[in-house]
Amino acid sequence: MEFRQLKYFIAVAEAGNMAAAAKRLHVSQPPITRQMQALEADLGVVLLERSHRGIELTAAGHAFLEDARRILELAGRSGDRSRAAARGDVGELSVAYFGTPIYRSLPLLLRAFLTSTPTATVSLTHMTKDEQVEGLLAGTIHVGFSRFFPRHPGIEIVNIAQEDLYLAVHRSQSGKFGKTCKLADLRAVELTLFPRGGRPSFADEVIGLFKHAGIEPRIARVVEDATAALALTMAGAASSIVPASVAAIRWPDIAFARIVGTRVKVPISCTFRKEKQPPILARFVEHVRRSAKD
C-alpha cells in the first residue's frame, strides 16, 4: 500500500467517478484505475462498485475511506513536525543552572525564547559548573548557565549580561550607606560571601574586585549560596554583596545599596557544546547570541 494509492482512492470516493478524480489530481485516468485495482488486490476486498450513478463505495470502501483520510492527515502532521524539529521549532531544551542567574536573567531569556518558539519546551536542572561541563560533553544537557565557567576546548562560553553589584544590609543599617556606595566605603564591613563551592566563584570575583582597588576585604564567612547569605542578613547577623538580579527581589528587612565604580560588575554566562548541536539547541544559541549583542 502506498500513500499515492490512498490519495487516489480518496479522490475517486469524493468525486464519484474516475474521470473527475483524474481531473482533480491532474493525471490521466488509466493510472488511477490501475492503482485502485492494485489497492483492492492488496487488501483482498472490493472497495469500489460501478453503478448507473458512477462509482459507489462498498461497506469496506466506506470503512477504508475513514482510515485513509486519517492516515494521510497523520502523515501530513508527522511531516510538519519533522520539518519543525529540523528547524528547532519543537522539542525539549534541557537547561542546567548554578547560582544566581536563576533569579532573573535566565527566566527572562527563556521567556523570550519560548515566546518566539511556542512549540518548544524547557526543562531546568540544578547542577554545579563542573557537572554542567560533564553533561554538555556527554549530551545529557543542552545548555548551562552560571558565572566563571572552567574553560574546556569542547564547549563555548558566551557572556549574556553584566550585572551591577549591591551591598545587602539589614534595614536597621541602611542609613550608613544610602542608595549607593563605593568599595572603599566597605573597608570596615564584615562580609558574608557566597557560594562556598564552584571555584572560581562569585565570591572569588568579589574578593578580586576589592584587591584590584587596593582594599583588603573583611570576610566573616563564605556560605553555600545567596539564600543563606541573605537569610543571615535578614537576621541582622551579616552583610553581603549580591548581583543586581538578587537585589531586584523584595527581601524582608534587607536594604540594598548599589556599589559604584569602574569594573564593579560581574558577568552571567551561557555555555554549550561547540559541535553536534541538535536543531533546538542551534536555534536557542542564535537567540542567546542576539540577546548578548543587545
From Swiss-Prot:
Domain HTH lysR-type: 1-58
Keywords from the UniProt entry: Activator, Aromatic hydrocarbons catabolism, DNA-binding, Plasmid, Transcription, Transcription regulation
Ranges of the DNA-binding region feature: 18-37
SUPFAM superfamilies assigned to the protein according to its UniProt record, in alphabetical order: Periplasmic binding protein-like II, Winged helix' DNA-binding domain
Coiled-coil residues: none
GO terms for cellular component: protein-DNA complex
Domain of life: Bacteria
Gene3D superfamilies: Periplasmic binding protein-like II, Winged helix-like DNA-binding domain superfamily/Winged helix DNA-binding domain
GO BP term, example: catabolic process
InterPro entries, alphabetized: LysR_subst-bd (IPR005119), Tscrpt_reg_HTH_LysR (IPR000847), WH-like_DNA-bd_sf (IPR036388), WH_DNA-bd_sf (IPR036390)
An MF annotation (GO) of this entry: DNA-binding transcription factor activity
PANTHER family: HTH-TYPE TRANSCRIPTIONAL REGULATOR CYNR, TRANSCRIPTIONAL DUAL REGULATOR HCAR-RELATED
Function: Involved in regulation of chlorinated catechol metabolism. Transcriptional activator of the tcbCDEF chlorocatechol oxidative operon. May bind 2-chloromuconate as an inducer.
Protein family (similarity comment): Belongs to the LysR transcriptional regulatory family.
Name listed for the protein in its UniProt record: HTH-type transcriptional regulator TcbR
Organism: Pseudomonas sp. (strain P51)
Lineage: Bacteria, Pseudomonadati, Pseudomonadota, Gammaproteobacteria, Pseudomonadales
